[in-house]
């Protein structure tokens, strides 16, 4: 898998390897039957869990770790980190390996008792603080303010505006802290081509059609201008924003290789698969 990762430092590769192996053991220990009973879409994840939960997502974590260690906090001074809605603590595990004090927040009850207990035990064993809270509806009063707040690939799953959530995260970010936000780019190159050809840029319709309500897949992905609007509405000031490709398997096929070769020739901006924004609290 290393040859499909984004380029980064040896330090980041090392902690990603450690975190990936720890999460592999955690995944192997979890009984997914309760999740599958609640939502049949989890069956494909259970059947190939390491691929879907780690290998498919690893570049998102590499990207964030690389930014933190080389640009945002190279001297390791912003030591308190909180990840909101992380589900499986892959990135938090890697951050603890780098010496950060990491808190994770998610409503693990939604994934079933077996999953919740497994993750709580894992956190106890790996120096992670965990709060089992609904990030939309529960109070964050018990959470300490953090130097770095993180929200990756979460808001696209919401069935409404993310403004309330981002406001809550802003209130738990120190005045001199930073917020790292990531969301799929609805206007990426492949999705623009799909739309031109008459195909939907959204999730497979059969998955959506046969899923229980509310749908737990991607309800609303975003554009770069929409991310800017969201950050401004939540009193964050964007310091850096970019799009990037995170799927390590998208260039394995000949079609994927062709698209990768073609994209640099397109005279348009913001064609990457994901949008990453780094923001500060507005003074």
Predicted regions and their residues:
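Short catalytic micro-motifs in class I SAM-dependent methyltransferases
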Residues: 153-157
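S-adenosyl-L-methionine-dependent methyltransferase catalytic module, highlighting the catalytic core
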Residues: 47-51, 55-59, 114, 121-122, ...
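Conserved N-terminal segment of class I S-adenosyl-L-methionine
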Residues: 1-148, 152, 163-166, 243-246, ...
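Short alpha-helical scaffold segments that flank and stabilize functional sites
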Residues: 67, 95, 176, 282-283
């Amino acid at each position: 898998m290393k040859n499909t990762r984004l380029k980064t430092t040896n330090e980041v590769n090392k902690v990603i390897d450690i975190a990936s192996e720890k999460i592999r053991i955690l995944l192997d220990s979890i009984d997914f039957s309760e999740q599958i009973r609640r939502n049949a879409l989890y069956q494909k994840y259970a059947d190939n869990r390491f691929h879907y939960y780690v290998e498919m997502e690893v570049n998102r974590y590499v990207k964030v770790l690389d930014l933190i260690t080389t640009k945002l906090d190279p001297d390791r001074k912003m030591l308190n980190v909180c990840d909101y809605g992380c589900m499986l603590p892959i990135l938090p595990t890697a951050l603890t390996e780098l010496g950060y004090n990491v808190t994770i927040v998610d409503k693990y009850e939604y994934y079933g008792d077996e999953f919740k207990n497994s993750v709580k035990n894992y956190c106890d064993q790996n120096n992670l603080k965990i709060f089992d809270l609904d990030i939309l509806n529960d109070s964050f009063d018990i959470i300490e303010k953090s130097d770095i707040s993180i929200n990756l690939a979460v808001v696209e799953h919401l069935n409404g505006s993310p403004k309330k959530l981002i406001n809550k995260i802003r209130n738990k970010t120190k005045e001199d802290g930073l917020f790292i936000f990531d969301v799929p780019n609805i206007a990426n190159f492949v999705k623009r081509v799909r739309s031109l050809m008459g195909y939907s840029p959204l999730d497979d319709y059969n998955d959506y059609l046969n899923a229980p309500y509310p749908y737990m897949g991607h309800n609303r992905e975003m554009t770069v201008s929409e991310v800017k609007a969201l950050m401004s509405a939540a009193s964050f000031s964007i310091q850096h924003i970019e799009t990037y490709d995170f799927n390590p398997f998208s260039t394995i096929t000949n079609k994927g290789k062709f698209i990768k070769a073609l994209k640099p020739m397109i005279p348009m901006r913001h064609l990457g698969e994901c949008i990453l924004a780094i923001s500060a609290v507005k003074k």
